[in-house]
Design a protein with these regions (language model features):
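N-terminal targeting pre-sequences for secretion and organelle import
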Residues: 152, 157-176
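Short linear, low-complexity motifs centered on an aromatic residue
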Residues: 1-3, 27
Length: 176
Protein backbone atom coordinates (compact mmCIF):
# COMPACT_ATOMS: atom_id res chain seq x y z
CA UNK A 1 0.00 0.00 0.00
CA UNK A 2 1.27 3.44 -0.79
CA UNK A 3 0.17 6.44 1.21
CA UNK A 4 0.10 10.06 0.05
CA UNK A 5 0.02 12.78 2.68
CA UNK A 6 -1.53 16.22 2.55
CA UNK A 7 -2.07 18.39 5.64
CA UNK A 8 -3.98 16.01 7.93
CA UNK A 9 -5.53 13.63 5.39
CA UNK A 10 -3.91 10.51 3.95
CA UNK A 11 -5.05 9.15 0.59
CA UNK A 12 -4.64 5.46 -0.14
CA UNK A 13 -3.43 4.21 -3.49
CA UNK A 14 -3.79 0.45 -3.20
CA UNK A 15 -3.16 -1.95 -6.04
CA UNK A 16 -5.77 -4.52 -5.11
CA UNK A 17 -5.45 -7.67 -7.15
CA UNK A 18 -8.67 -8.77 -5.49
CA UNK A 19 -10.52 -5.71 -6.75
CA UNK A 20 -9.19 -6.16 -10.26
CA UNK A 21 -10.35 -9.76 -10.23
CA UNK A 22 -13.76 -8.88 -8.83
CA UNK A 23 -14.99 -5.92 -10.81
CA UNK A 24 -17.40 -7.25 -13.36
CA UNK A 25 -17.71 -5.64 -16.74
CA UNK A 26 -16.30 -2.19 -16.29
CA UNK A 27 -13.47 0.17 -15.58
CA UNK A 28 -12.68 1.31 -12.08
CA UNK A 29 -14.32 4.51 -10.91
CA UNK A 30 -12.22 7.05 -9.08
CA UNK A 31 -12.44 6.51 -5.34
CA UNK A 32 -12.15 9.16 -2.69
CA UNK A 33 -11.19 6.66 0.04
CA UNK A 34 -9.10 8.49 2.64
CA UNK A 35 -7.95 8.37 6.25
CA UNK A 36 -9.53 11.17 8.27
CA UNK A 37 -9.73 12.27 11.91
CA UNK A 38 -12.68 10.52 13.60
CA UNK A 39 -14.01 11.57 16.99
CA UNK A 40 -16.77 9.09 17.75
CA UNK A 41 -16.66 6.48 20.47
CA UNK A 42 -16.25 3.24 18.52
CA UNK A 43 -13.86 0.32 18.72
CA UNK A 44 -11.36 -0.26 15.88
CA UNK A 45 -13.02 -2.42 13.23
CA UNK A 46 -16.43 -0.79 13.70
CA UNK A 47 -18.21 0.45 10.57
CA UNK A 48 -20.11 3.72 10.99
CA UNK A 49 -22.43 4.94 8.22
CA UNK A 50 -23.50 8.57 8.42
CA UNK A 51 -26.49 8.69 6.11
CA UNK A 52 -26.74 12.48 5.85
CA UNK A 53 -23.07 12.66 4.81
CA UNK A 54 -23.32 9.65 2.49
CA UNK A 55 -20.06 8.32 3.93
CA UNK A 56 -19.03 5.05 5.54
CA UNK A 57 -16.24 5.14 8.12
CA UNK A 58 -14.12 2.15 9.13
CA UNK A 59 -12.69 3.00 12.55
CA UNK A 60 -8.96 2.21 12.63
CA UNK A 61 -8.18 3.66 16.07
CA UNK A 62 -5.97 6.48 17.33
CA UNK A 63 -8.73 8.96 16.49
CA UNK A 64 -8.77 8.00 12.79
CA UNK A 65 -11.04 6.20 10.35
CA UNK A 66 -10.98 5.31 6.67
CA UNK A 67 -13.78 7.25 4.97
CA UNK A 68 -15.50 5.89 1.86
CA UNK A 69 -18.18 7.62 -0.24
CA UNK A 70 -21.41 5.59 -0.42
CA UNK A 71 -24.98 5.64 -1.67
CA UNK A 72 -27.62 5.18 1.01
CA UNK A 73 -31.36 4.54 1.16
CA UNK A 74 -33.64 6.89 -0.68
CA UNK A 75 -36.31 8.72 1.36
CA UNK A 76 -38.68 6.21 2.93
CA UNK A 77 -36.17 3.36 2.52
CA UNK A 78 -33.55 4.40 5.09
CA UNK A 79 -32.93 2.58 8.35
CA UNK A 80 -30.93 3.48 11.43
CA UNK A 81 -29.48 1.30 14.15
CA UNK A 82 -26.81 -1.25 14.87
CA UNK A 83 -26.20 -4.63 13.22
CA UNK A 84 -23.28 -7.01 12.81
CA UNK A 85 -21.57 -8.26 9.66
CA UNK A 86 -22.79 -11.86 9.43
CA UNK A 87 -21.35 -12.84 6.05
CA UNK A 88 -18.76 -11.93 3.43
CA UNK A 89 -19.47 -12.82 -0.19
CA UNK A 90 -17.48 -12.32 -3.39
CA UNK A 91 -19.44 -11.64 -6.57
CA UNK A 92 -22.71 -12.67 -4.93
CA UNK A 93 -25.83 -13.63 -6.82
CA UNK A 94 -28.80 -11.36 -6.13
CA UNK A 95 -32.39 -12.32 -5.44
CA UNK A 96 -34.48 -9.14 -5.67
CA UNK A 97 -36.39 -8.46 -2.42
CA UNK A 98 -40.18 -8.18 -2.56
CA UNK A 99 -40.24 -4.36 -2.37
CA UNK A 100 -37.80 -4.14 -5.28
CA UNK A 101 -39.82 -6.70 -7.30
CA UNK A 102 -42.99 -4.72 -6.60
CA UNK A 103 -41.43 -1.60 -8.13
CA UNK A 104 -39.68 -3.56 -10.92
CA UNK A 105 -41.91 -6.54 -11.80
CA UNK A 106 -39.83 -7.53 -14.86
CA UNK A 107 -36.73 -8.37 -12.81
CA UNK A 108 -35.68 -12.02 -12.96
CA UNK A 109 -35.95 -14.20 -9.84
CA UNK A 110 -32.15 -14.28 -9.52
CA UNK A 111 -29.24 -12.43 -11.12
CA UNK A 112 -26.02 -14.41 -11.12
CA UNK A 113 -22.88 -13.05 -9.48
CA UNK A 114 -20.63 -11.18 -11.89
CA UNK A 115 -23.46 -10.39 -14.32
CA UNK A 116 -23.33 -6.76 -15.53
CA UNK A 117 -26.94 -6.21 -14.35
CA UNK A 118 -26.21 -7.52 -10.83
CA UNK A 119 -26.47 -4.57 -8.41
CA UNK A 120 -24.37 -6.32 -5.72
CA UNK A 121 -21.13 -5.64 -7.58
CA UNK A 122 -17.78 -7.09 -6.54
CA UNK A 123 -18.57 -8.12 -2.97
CA UNK A 124 -21.14 -7.91 -0.20
CA UNK A 125 -21.02 -7.80 3.58
CA UNK A 126 -24.42 -9.07 4.74
CA UNK A 127 -25.87 -7.68 7.95
CA UNK A 128 -27.42 -9.59 10.85
CA UNK A 129 -30.91 -8.17 10.40
CA UNK A 130 -31.17 -10.21 7.19
CA UNK A 131 -32.56 -7.46 5.00
CA UNK A 132 -29.58 -5.22 4.19
CA UNK A 133 -25.97 -5.41 3.03
CA UNK A 134 -22.98 -3.23 2.35
CA UNK A 135 -22.11 -4.04 -1.25
CA UNK A 136 -20.58 -2.91 -4.52
CA UNK A 137 -22.63 -1.60 -7.40
CA UNK A 138 -23.28 -1.75 -11.12
CA UNK A 139 -24.32 1.93 -10.92
CA UNK A 140 -21.21 3.82 -9.78
CA UNK A 141 -22.86 7.15 -10.66
CA UNK A 142 -25.22 6.58 -7.71
CA UNK A 143 -22.40 6.83 -5.14
CA UNK A 144 -22.87 9.98 -3.07
CA UNK A 145 -26.66 9.95 -3.46
CA UNK A 146 -29.81 8.68 -1.75
CA UNK A 147 -30.50 5.84 -4.18
CA UNK A 148 -30.98 2.39 -2.63
CA UNK A 149 -33.76 0.44 -0.95
CA UNK A 150 -31.76 0.59 2.29
CA UNK A 151 -28.49 -1.13 1.43
CA UNK A 152 -25.20 0.75 1.53
CA UNK A 153 -23.63 0.91 -1.96
CA UNK A 154 -19.91 1.40 -2.51
CA UNK A 155 -17.59 1.67 -5.47
CA UNK A 156 -16.47 -1.87 -6.32
CA UNK A 157 -12.82 -1.16 -5.49
CA UNK A 158 -13.89 0.32 -2.15
CA UNK A 159 -16.06 -2.64 -1.16
CA UNK A 160 -13.15 -4.93 -2.11
CA UNK A 161 -10.89 -2.88 0.18
CA UNK A 162 -13.44 -2.97 3.02
CA UNK A 163 -13.96 -6.72 2.47
CA UNK A 164 -10.26 -7.31 3.16
CA UNK A 165 -10.26 -5.13 6.30
CA UNK A 166 -13.46 -6.27 8.04
CA UNK A 167 -14.24 -9.53 9.83
CA UNK A 168 -17.53 -11.34 10.28
CA UNK A 169 -18.87 -10.08 13.60
CA UNK A 170 -17.83 -6.46 13.00
CA UNK A 171 -20.30 -3.94 14.39
CA UNK A 172 -22.13 -1.70 11.90
CA UNK A 173 -23.80 1.49 13.13
CA UNK A 174 -26.04 3.45 10.75
CA UNK A 175 -26.96 6.96 11.88
CA UNK A 176 -28.59 10.04 10.42
Amino acid sequence: MSTYRTTNVRFFGKGLVLAAALVAGGAFQASAREVVPFKAVAEPGTIVVRTSERHLYLVVGNGEAIRYPVAVGKPGKQWFGSEMVDGKHLRPAWVPPEDVKKDNPNLPEIIQGGAPNNPMGAAALTLSGGKYAIHGTNRPESIGTFASYGCIRMHNEDVADLYERVSVGARVVVSK
